[in-house]
């Protein structure tokens, strides 16, 4: 199994696979893998067959945490996650850092959604002002109490899809 942290390297590899007609299955995660994640990997392997490739992303996305949500305490164990991925037959563990995914240097955005609320930002600011927003479903259930959560999720998933270019994505 190969660990990739660079967006450019992930894009190059995905492009090589696609040019050779290799199917790519993708399992996006925030790491700290468990049996549920591994069942998603097994499904991903089935979906592309033995000639396909499986990419698992391991990235704790700061944009899906709101104020007063403890981004810094989200559990992480990359060494264990990589071992589990290798044992499960994953081809690539894509593990970008925040500087790769949001390369703004951590500058606070003038349009920060937290500034208007008068709260302190509990997660690293990305400095970005462009996001992918789903306006109907994100207002229900968890979205009702976490107003920026799904904006962060939809944005990072769109970015990951553009990088990995999967034929299949498996979510749990």
Regions found by a protein language model. Give the residues of each.
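Nucleotidyltransferase catalytic core that binds NTPs
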Residues: 1-172
